[in-house]
Amino acid sequence: MDTPLRRSRRLEGLKPLSPENLPVPEVSRAKRALVDFKSNSEETGELKSTRVPPLSLPSPGPQPETSPGSPCPPLSLPSPGPQPETSPGSPCPPLSLPSPGPQPETSPGSPCPPLSLPSPGPQPETSPGSPCPPLSLPSPGPQPEASPGSPGPRQDADDGSPQRQPEPHPGSLQPHQDLGLESPAGQTESSPESPQREQPSKLPPPQGELDSEAAHAKEEVIPGSPEPCPGQQAPGPEPSQPAQELTVQAPSSPERQLEPGKLPPAGETVTESLNLKKRVIASPQAPASKKLKEKEELPVIPKGKPKSGRVWKDRSKKRFSQMVQDKPLRTSWQRKMKERQERKLAKDFARHLEEEKQRRRQEKKERRAENLRRRLENERKAEIVQVIRNPAKLKKAKKKQLRSIEKRDTLALLQKQPPQRPVAKV
């Protein structure tokens, strides 16, 4: 698809046309119909030639169609900019600068191929009498046709000047072919006499050659191909041809020898295909990452209280055995003094209880001793005794009797009691 450009950018680098050079709509339609009619007759003739499958390289846009008279294959270079036009007498291939502008077409009799870069838009065509093929790669803009009789290569002066494709030249006998539908990378349609394959290259031409060609492009004006008005749309590409035309190739055409400076290295073609694959693969990964983020952002729905009433089954709550408050790291001074006083009172009370117990034990022991002493005294007072006043009697007493006689302190008794006769012991 061609990106719509602003009017200021479309008119950039274009020279004003005189009233006699302005295209007439009726004449343009007649020329376009003539080109379509002749291209259809030539394409039916191409089906009868020998078929050799061409080698296609990845190109995001439609590729050029090589007409039956071209002995050189199309070689495509990656250039998004406008391409130069090659006239019949041009001995050297024009080099293209990267520009979003149109691409060239090679008119009949042009001996050298135009070089263009990969473009998603329509690609240049090689008319029946052209001995050299166009070298094209995808370019985002439409392509102009080269007019017969131009003495040298032509190139647009402004790299970024987006020009519309002019009306088809009467000498150009084939319409644009849109080959983007046949293959995702795009394939070129080879003519019966072109055995070479197109080779994309990303190397731009030297700066000196670009400057010289830009100067030539400013001076040259094609008399046979009028440029369209700003509001006029360029003719669109024709629908792609069947796959049989892509394989047609003639054995009698000479091989195209490319200059070493313009040969694209094989590594760059592989790199271009890898880059295209990476772009295609990277696109579906972006929505996948967004889906993962959306899943992570989903809020966790908390569970309600269990029917059994056991609250520890809730993950946010703990069991009762775990609901013990830990001792805080710091306590207030008043609380600390209160706890110290309580500990002191508890210790004093324990000591008081111990002393009370010891005192009771001591008092009990003293009572026992006192009771024993009083009992012995009571027993002595209650004894029945006989006072022996005559000591000679004691001498006459036998030893057995003397054993039973105990000596007592009877002085107090004698003084308290009047002397009486002691009762003899039985």
Swiss-Prot record:
Region annotation (Disordered) ranges: 1-426
Any coiled-coil regions, as ranges: 346-389
Residues modified to Phosphothreonine: T66
Biased composition (Polar residues): 241-255
GO cellular component: chromosome; nucleolus; nucleoplasm; nucleus
Compartments (UniProt record): Nucleus; Chromosome; Nucleus, Nucleolus
Basic residues bias spans: 304-320, 392-402
Entry PTM: Citrullinated by PADI4.
Expressing tissues: Highly expressed in testis. Also expressed in heart, liver, kidney.
Compositional bias ranges of the Pro residues kind: 55-145
Induction comment from the UniProt entry of this chain: By interleukin-3 (IL3).
Keywords of the record: Chromosome, Citrullination, Coiled coil, Nucleus, Phosphoprotein
Residue ranges with Basic and acidic residues bias: 33-49, 339-383
Chain positions found as Phosphoserine: S18, S59, S67, S70, S161, S172, S183, S191, S194, S225, S252, S253, S283
PANTHER family: COILED-COIL DOMAIN-CONTAINING PROTEIN 86 (PTHR13557:SF1)
Function: Required for proper chromosome segregation during mitosis and error-free mitotic progression.
Descriptive protein name: Coiled-coil domain-containing protein 86
Native source species: Mus musculus (Mouse)
GN (gene name): Ccdc86
